[in-house]
């Protein structure tokens, strides 16, 4: 709704941004209701801004809206996934505090390190096979080798892990 102006609003117009986030949360809850009514099992909430802001700004402007949205989805009996593009490593901890059922991360996040953070909250981490360079342009063997290497880096692969493409 604001494009890149949202970044300036965090500094110049925080009250307006809070009211905008309240509005968009209500819209997101209504949209979630439509999806839930169709019978979805998991509802992904996608945010392109998280990787571009500080944890302080996330806490100030996004924590409450996301927490409310994930609580609403859970109350409706559906699982939620917090899907972020870009390197949101610095915000993984504050994202977990919004209590989604899963967090889907992009290919430029160290999945093994991310899983260590996210596991502290007993949240599932999802990601992050490179979609273009590995899956589209690579061979089947490239993909298999990538996954084996990734599994070798992750301490606990049998809990709270969904292997999938990143956001590309």
Model-found features: residue ranges?
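Active-site loop segments of alpha/beta catalytic cores
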Residues: 1-168
């Amino acid at each position: 709704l604001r494009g890149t102006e949202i970044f300036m609003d965090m500094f110049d117009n925080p009250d307006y941004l809070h009211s905008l986030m309240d509005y968009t949360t209500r819209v997101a809850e209504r949209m979630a209701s439509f999806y839930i009514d169709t019978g979805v099992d998991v509802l992904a909430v996608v945010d392109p801004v998280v990787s571009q802001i500080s944890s302080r700004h996330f806490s100030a402007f996004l924590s409450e809206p996301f927490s409310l949205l994930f609580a609403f989805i859970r109350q409706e009996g559906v699982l939620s996934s917090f899907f972020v593009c870009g390197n949101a490593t610095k915000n993984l901890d504050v994202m977990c505090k919004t209590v989604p059922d899963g967090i889907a991360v992009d290919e430029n996040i160290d999945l093994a390190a991310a899983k260590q953070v996210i596991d502290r909250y007993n949240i599932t981490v999802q990601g992050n096979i490179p979609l273009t360079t590995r899956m589209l342009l690579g061979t089947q063997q490239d993909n298999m080798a990538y996954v084996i290497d990734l599994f070798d880096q992750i301490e606990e692969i049998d809990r709270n892990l969904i292997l999938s493409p990143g956001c590309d």
